[in-house]
């Protein structure tokens, strides 16, 4: 998809704030600082529509981005960030669960995982949760530019094994720095529109 128009529509904390449109939605999930905002910005050819931050735990709402009047990206709060209180974390967890299990417009979830490291327990739980609810998942392995290309396959195998990866899902190696995987990500997303 060639994106010329993208805007943030609303930052929602509850279902009554979700956009009323029937446009398909693609949710973006991943632990704090995995590169969700950079992923959005790369896909929509913008520097900073989605605010990137060195501070983990920055996204605390469901941020709906309208893309080309054709779909919404929904950025969900990053999980696994220790400096957020248990109460906060439980609140985010409930908000994410409500959205993922009840939103009819949700077509697929892009689950972002850092290619450099084995998936965390949170990454694995998120993947299992999405599979339990029968949601199509696109795994995007971020920060590929940080490791030599020759090691990508090994890292991909480690991630797939830890997740007990479903071969029906897409697996994309991605870098917001080099734009590696940008086209593949759009191809995977467009299948669900």
Curated annotation (Swiss-Prot):
UniProtKB keywords: Cell cycle, Cell division, GTP-binding, Magnesium, Metal-binding, Nucleotide-binding, Septation
A molecular-function term among this protein's GO annotations: GTP binding
Cell cycle as UniProt keyword: yes
KW Cytoplasm (keyword) present: no
A single cellular component GO annotation: cytosol
Domain EngB-type G: 22-193
Residues annotated as binding GTP: 30-37, 57-61, 75-78, 142-145, 174-176
Binding site for Mg(2+): 37, 59
GO biological process: division septum assembly
Cofactor(s) it depends on: Mg(2+)
Domain of life: Bacteria
Family under the similarity heading: Belongs to the TRAFAC class TrmE-Era-EngA-EngB-Septin-like GTPase superfamily. EngB GTPase family.
Summary of the function given for this chain in its UniProt record: Necessary for normal cell division and for the maintenance of normal septation.
NCBIfam families found in the cross-reference section: GTPase_YsxC
Protein name according to UniProt: Probable GTP-binding protein EngB
